[in-house]
């Protein structure tokens, strides 16, 4: 699990009062995986998609007012002559909680979230593909999230805890 400390305002846009809340998801894991790959000489990019998560908690759905999760992040690594997608998303605790198999990554095939859980219920559905980026498109992501999740950002901007909403 990637844990980040809360800081006062992000250094990129200065408008996010608690940057760690916003980045405590799959996107920072993708940024970290991409940076780690690059640090050992593996060409890597960031990829983003909107997804529909059919196994979300009701608290989170109420907070976001939708089941569409925008800007789901993943890494794209250049291995053995081709680009391979890798989703660094759920830890084993989340997989167990929602009855999904942990994602495997063999370095040859794309590793995306499973479409169905272990009970054959819909789990993850990929909707919009934003493409690949050399760097995190932070301003674009924040602008998009603020317009799509006003209730969430109202809590964040008022320094309210959202910890129990997940």
Q: Where do the PLM segments sit?
A:
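Secondary-structure boundary elements
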Residues: 1-21
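Weak global preference for isoleucine
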Residues: 6-7, 21-22, 42, 92, ...
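Generic recognition of cysteine residues
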Residues: 10-16, 36, 78, 95
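N-terminal start-of-chain detector that recognizes signal peptides
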Residues: 16-17, 45-50, 57-58
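Conserved, aromatic- and glycine-enriched, well-ordered alpha/beta core segments
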Residues: 17-24, 62-64
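Cysteine-centered nucleophilic/redox motifs
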Residues: 22-48, 75
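His-Asp-centered catalytic microenvironments across diverse enzyme cores
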Residues: 51-166
């Amino acid at each position: 699990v990637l844990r980040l400390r809360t800081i006062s305002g992000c250094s990129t846009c200065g408008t996010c009062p608690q940057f760690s809340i916003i980045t405590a998801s799959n996107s920072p894991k993708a940024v970290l995986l991409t940076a780690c790959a690059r640090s050992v000489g593996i060409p890597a990019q960031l990829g983003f998609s909107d997804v529909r998560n059919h196994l979300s908690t009701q608290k989170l759905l109420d907070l976001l007012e939708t089941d569409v999760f925008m800007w789901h992040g993943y890494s794209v690594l250049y291995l053995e002559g081709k680009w391979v997608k890798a989703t660094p998303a759920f830890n084993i605790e989340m997989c167990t909680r929602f009855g999904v198999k942990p994602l495997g990554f063999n370095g040859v095939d794309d590793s995306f979230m499973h479409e169905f859980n272990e009970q054959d219920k819909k789990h993850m559905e990929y909707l919009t593909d934003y493409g690949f980026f050399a760097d995190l498109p932070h301003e674009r992501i924040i602008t998009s999230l603020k317009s799509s999740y006003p209730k969430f950002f109202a809590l964040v901007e008022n320094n309210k805890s959202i910890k129990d909403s997940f």
